[in-house]
């Protein structure tokens, strides 16, 4: 079994991605700085707005150019015609599959964001399909939380493997 090894992660560049304008992106960035005060002002904050990309490939190129340590965004970017319930949206879905950069997915969606409030982050959920041996993702979660916060580690299985587990449990 691979053991977890803590490493202090320094988040130097944060990309705030929104489908709105520069004012909306900066306001969101200010809210995230309050939410993540230990990253706050020490990081270089870059703002990517809806007029800078028109499709997923455009956004991927921008992310490659700015090379952030953390991407902050909402579900369902640039999908105002949809009423999202159980989807990340095309942009976030592709970014999670093609980029190695951790993504801080904010509550709500781009069309209906939930306010972060004025408190610092008290809990982070790490979601991946292969958590074992992924120290970097867990260390990024630690970097986003204050002391005495909670981190949930969520391992997602595909349907085939999940059914196999259920069958094995059923035989016990």
Which residue ranges define each predicted feature?
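Small/aliphatic-rich secondary-structure junction motif
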Residues: 1-50, 120-172
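Charged docking surfaces used in two-component/phosphorelay signaling
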Residues: 48-58
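Residue-level detector of flexible, active-site-proximal loop/helix-junction positions
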Residues: 52-54, 110, 158
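Amphipathic coiled-coil/heptad-repeat helices and related helical stalk/stem segments
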Residues: 55-56, 88, 134-138
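Gly/Ser-rich helix-loop-strand patches that form or flank binding pockets
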Residues: 60-115
């Amino acid at each position: 079994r691979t053991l977890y090894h803590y490493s202090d992660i320094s988040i130097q560049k944060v990309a705030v991605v929104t489908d709105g304008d520069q004012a909306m992106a900066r306001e969101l960035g200010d809210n995230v700085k309050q939410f993540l005060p230990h990253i706050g002002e020490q990081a270089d904050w870059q703002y990517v707005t809806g007029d800078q990309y028109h499709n997923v490939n455009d956004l991927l190129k921008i992310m490659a150019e700015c090379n952030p340590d953390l991407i902050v965004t909402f579900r369902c970017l640039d999908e105002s015609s949809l009423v999202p319930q159980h989807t990340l949206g095309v942009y976030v879905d592709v970014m999670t599959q093609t980029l190695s950069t951790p993504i801080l997915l904010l509550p709500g969606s781009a069309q209906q964001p939930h306010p972060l409030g004025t408190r610092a982050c008290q809990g982070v959920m790490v979601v991946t399909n292969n958590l074992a041996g992924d120290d970097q993702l867990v260390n990024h979660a630690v970097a986003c939380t204050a002391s005495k916060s909670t981190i949930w580690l969520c391992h997602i299985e595909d349907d085939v493997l999940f059914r196999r587990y259920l069958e094995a449990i059923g035989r016990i």
